[in-house]
Regions:
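Bacterial N-terminal signal peptides
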Residues: 7-15
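Positively charged n-region of N-terminal signal peptides that target proteins for export
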Residues: 1-5
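N-terminal soluble domains immediately following signal/targeting peptides that reside
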Residues: 36-181
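Cleaved targeting-peptide boundary
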Residues: 20-34
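Intrinsic disorder/low-structure terminal segments
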Residues: 10-11, 20, 146
Length: 181
């Protein structure tokens, strides 16, 4: 897991300067505009870092996108939906198909979402995927399957650090693939 921590640190350091610049650049432009912050229903983020034979991904989403609610499950039906979500997110195939190379999940960590909700009751789920790929240079496409599984998800903001450089893009129900190379 040291490699995963390294990759997260690398990703954050590469993007910190652009975030600080963007914040400074638009500080005066904020008056009169409403900003949504990190918790927007219908939207999730996927950070992806590829280094050597490793592919690390971090998915963050409001629970509303995956469950249809953000509170602790109360009814038997809600408890069942919640357990199904945990099992689905712990399977790589729920997130994506990797085309061009064989990748194996070394570690998938789904964080308990109800330990960190804000005062307004907004709750996010965080999932970290750490993969080992046989021939990562042959990866041609990542097909994101989340939209097929979770109908409340409308947009996936993707930030990637690849050997070829950094890239940001938005995926939605019509555009579900990330071309690599």
């Amino acid at each position: 897991m040291r490699v995963a921590a390294y990759l997260v640190t690398l990703f954050c350091s590469l993007n910190l300067s652009s975030i600080v610049y963007a914040q400074d650049k638009h500080q005066d432009h904020d008056a009169g505009h409403r900003h949504h912050g990190a918790h927007v229903h219908g939207m999730a983020t996927l950070d992806l870092v590829m280094d050597d034979h490793h592919l690390m991904m971090h998915l963050k989403s409001p629970l509303m996108n995956f469950l249809g609610f953000e509170h602790q499950p109360e009814t038997e039906q809600q408890k069942s939906i919640y357990q199904d979500m945990l099992q689905q997110l712990a399977m790589l195939a729920t997130l994506m198909e990797i085309k061009g190379s064989s990748c194996k999940a070394e570690s998938i960590e789904v964080e308990e979402p109800f330990t960190d909700s804000d005062e307004a009751g907004h709750t996010d789920v965080d999932v970290s995927y750490f993969l080992s790929c046989e021939e990562p240079e042959n990866i041609t496409e990542l097909k994101i399957n989340l939209f097929d599984v979770y109908s409340n998800l409308e947009t996936l903001q993707v930030q990637m650090v690849l050997p070829s450089g950094q890239q940001q893009l938005k995926l939605n129900q019509q555009r579900t693939s990330i071309r690599i190379q």
